[in-house]
A protein has these predicted regions:
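Short loop/turn segments that connect beta-strands within beta-propeller blades
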Residues: 83-87, 123-127, 207-211, 259-263, ...
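Conserved beta-propeller blade repeats
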Residues: 46-61, 96-112, 136-154, 180, ...
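Cap/lid segment of the alpha/beta-hydrolase catalytic domain
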Residues: 243-244, 409, 416-540, 547, ...
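Active-site-proximal cap/loop segments of hydrolase catalytic domains
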Residues: 495-686
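A short beta-strand motif characteristic of beta-propeller blades
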Residues: 40-44, 89-93, 128-133, 214-217, ...
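Structural motif
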Residues: 72-78, 118-120, 162-163, 200-202, ...
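Beta-strand-rich domains and repeat architectures in extracellular enzymes and scaffolds
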Residues: 41-77
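Predominantly five- to eight-bladed beta-propeller fold
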Residues: 76-77, 156-204, 239, 249-253, ...
Length: 686
């Protein structure tokens, strides 16, 4: 696509020819088979691109191709390469390796990557691959030294857990119970990881040809995240929270310079709030980083900053941009940076000069959250200033696209088509953008309507309101397999960004600060009314569902209205008092989401808890949660289930063994969730 300076889109000749070629190739294949709606097990046929990394000296791009392993019920990843014009797409690693984190050497001769917990190298000229590490723990944040001789990475270093009690009298060879586990750490469990081992993440380097890793950091602190070498290769810049009270400051961090030879640390930033993701400019003179002054708000936009290489002259580049900076990379000439942020639900790349006005280049970044239409994408800058990124669409998961700027214009060419074989045989639900006014204060609320295949506006359809989690996240114009599967069953699906959502400015996101749920409920009901007013919805067949924060609003809604025939609450929070004392991030939630600790202000916690309104519920309700969810623990689901049982309300609980808060990490769970939701809704249709 070509994008003019006002952001309007027109098809380029390249894209048109690409689509015509794809159509001509697919016509014969479709001749003997009918196009049909998506099926539940199509989940296993989805693929998507992520982690694009362009070579420093050619048009070759390496990226991660993600796919679903039906036999192992896992999402797997392999490395592929493609030229910037879309030609020469080929596999770099085999499906036997679960590969990720590709990083080019500075001269473009090698690619380092992580596969099955070890660092591997791929030699471009010979095509040879080799494992170069034998680590006890998995590495992350691979970073090449400027001379290509070293690779830095972060890795967890376990520490022997202490136990103050030793039980006497155990005979040799006796089969006693497992010993008690003694815990005295504030951070003792995490969603997706379970109960944490004692230890911390540290920074290491190792020779690029393989060898013994050298530990560079020390102390009882975590050192992880993005790293960047100084131009002479003698120092590494990184971020960490090394304050003594770091456990009670869950988001604070500073930028440090680490002298590799002496191990000396120099702190370059100093403020109350996170400073992170340092990147040295190509000319070696400056460091860019992201951060924010912490005001203890539930949502705070991180801005882009630059400083001299010695930490002096810190200045903000995006103070006038009321959005959260999600990523950034230096332009090759060091005169500015390319930045990535969400605006009105859409992933946006802009060029931010060191001095002067920024220029928006595209708003089509995203596609990584293929399950539900959350924002989220990735990009990287090529040596000649072109940008490769994950391209978003409502009709398919993330593909790769390349953005160029010939003669002052902006052109975007999609260069992969990973899901063509599946999607040319499936009828995908059409998505339409809508805006409507909130009945609370007339604020404009943004949303999207997904129509079932074969939609006829003269007919009446059941409506599903699908609510995003967070609550400080955003939906957008992205492919969403779960919602598509609902639409494939004949439902119109509405999804919106009510107050509290991100990408509409910090003030809009914080309209629910210390006040959640509240008028976000009204924004959602206004969206339902706006769709009903279009004339194609059966008002007696309204349904509601949502996950995490969307589960909160689902259970809140049925405690405040009886308009829905049935509800499905996915991993909800029911009782804020019990939540903050059971969730893994309790030291964050109590400081940023609530005005006081629960025993100091129990009325506030209960006022905003769906359990306080369960006596009003008449709606049949399905509850669906992972048994290993440490973010919104299954005890929340159990509270609501038992309350509804005591009230005699038709209810069911679906428990997913071994599943964390991220239910869709196993493809079969991704398939099960919409299947159970549709089963429940069909049960209560007219």
């Amino acid at each position: 696509m070509q994008i003019n300076n006002r952001g309007k889109h027109v098809k380029t000749l390249y894209s048109t020819l690409f689509l015509l070629l794809a159509w001509s190739l697919s016509t014969a294949a479709l001749a003997d088979s009918d196009v049909r709606p998506l099926q539940y097990d199509d989940v296993f046929l989805l693929e998507f691109a992520s982690s694009p990394a362009p070579a420093p000296n050619s048009d070759t791009i390496v990226f991660v191709r993600n796919w679903m392993d039906r036999m192992q019920d896992r999402t797997r990843s392999t490395l592929w390469t493609v030229n910037a014009d879309g030609s020469n797409l080929q596999a770099l690693t085999s499906k036997d390796q679960n590969a990720s984190q590709p990083v080019w050497s500075p001269d473009g001769s090698r690619i380092a990557y992580v596969a099955d917990g070890q660092i591997h190298l791929y030699w471009v000229n010979s095509g040879r691959q080799a494992q170069i590490s034998h680590l006890q723990q998995g590495p992350g944040n691979l970073t090449w030294s400027p001379d290509g001789r070293w690779i830095a990475f972060s890795m967890f270093e376990p520490k022997r857990a202490s136990n103050p009690v030793s039980l006497p009298g155990r005979p040799e060879g006796a089969n006693w119970a497992e010993p008690p586990i003694f815990i005295d750490d504030m951070n003792y469990r995490a969603d997706g990881r379970g109960y944490l081992r004692a230890g911390h993440r540290h920074i290491y380097i190792m020779p690029a040809e393989g060898g013994t890793p050298i530990k560079l950091t020390s102390g009882d602190f975590d050192h992880s995240g993005q790293m960047s070498f100084s131009p002479d290769g003698k120092s590494i810049f990184f971020s960490a929270n090394r304050y003594e009270d770091w456990k009670s400051q869950p988001i604070n961090s500073e930028i440090f310079r680490l002298d590799i030879e002496s191990r000396e640390l120099t702190q370059l930033t100093d403020r109350n709030g996170p400073d992170h993701s340092p990147v040295v400019s190509p000319d070696g003179r400056m460091i860019a980083f992201a951060g924010v002054d912490d005001r203890r708000l539930a949502h705070q936009n991180h801005g882009l900053y630059v400083m001299n290489i010695d930490g002096s002259n810190i200045r903000a580049l995006t103070a006038d941009l009321d959005q959260h900076i999600r990523g950034f990379e230096w332009a090759p000439d060091s005169t500015g940076l390319f930045i990535y942020y969400d605006a009105k639900g859409s992933g946006t790349i802009a060029h931010q000069p060191l001095r002067g006005n920024r220029t928006v280049l595209t708003d089509e970044v995203g596609g990584l959250a293929y399950s539900r239409p959350y924002s989220g994408g990735a990009f990287s800058v090529m040596a000649d200033g072109r940008v490769v990124f994950t391209h978003a669409s409502t009709e398919r998961p993330a593909e790769l696209a390349v953005l160029s700027q010939p003669r002052g214009s902006v052109r975007v060419n999609t260069i992969t088509d990973l899901n063509r074989d599946l999607l040319m045989k499936r009828d995908i639900g059409r998505v339409e953008e809508i805006w409507y006014a909130s009945s609370v204060d007339e604020k404009p609320i943004h949303g999207w309507i997904m129509y079932p295949p074969g939609f006829d506006p003269e007919k009446k359809y059941p409506l599903i309101l699908e609510i995003h989690g967070g609550p400080h996240t955003a939906y957008g114009p992205y492919f969403a397999m779960e919602l598509q599967l609902m639409a494939a069953q004949g439902y119109v699906v509405l999804y919106t960004n009510p107050r509290g959502s991100t990408s509409y400015g910090e003030d809009f996101a914080n309209l629910i600060h210390h006040n959640y749920p509240s008028h976000d409920f009204d924004d959602l009901m206004d969206g339902v009314d706006a769709v009903i007013a279009r004339g194609y919805i059966n008002e007696d067949e309204l349904f509601i569902t949502g996950g995490s924060g969307g589960g909160v609003l689902t259970t809140w809604a049925i405690g405040h209205t009886d308009r829905f025939r049935a509800a499905a609450a996915i991993n909800p929070v029911i009782n804020w008092y019990s939540f903050v004392l059971n969730a893994d991030m309790y030291n964050y939630f109590t400081q940023y989401w609530f005005p006081a600790l629960p025993w100091e202000d129990p009325e506030h916690y209960l006022k905003h808890s769906p359990i306080s309104y369960v006596g009003n519920v008449t709606t049949p309700t399905l509850l669906f949660t992972g048994e290993a969810d440490h973010r919104t623990p299954i005890s929340e689901t159990e509270q609501y289930y038992q309350a509804l049982q005591l009230l005699g309300i038709d209810t069911a609980m679906v428990r997913i063994p071994g599943a964390s808060h991220a239910l869709h990490t196993r493809p079969s769970n991704h398939m099960a969730k919409p299947a159970y939701v549709i089963y429940w809704f069909e049960k209560y249709r007219e």
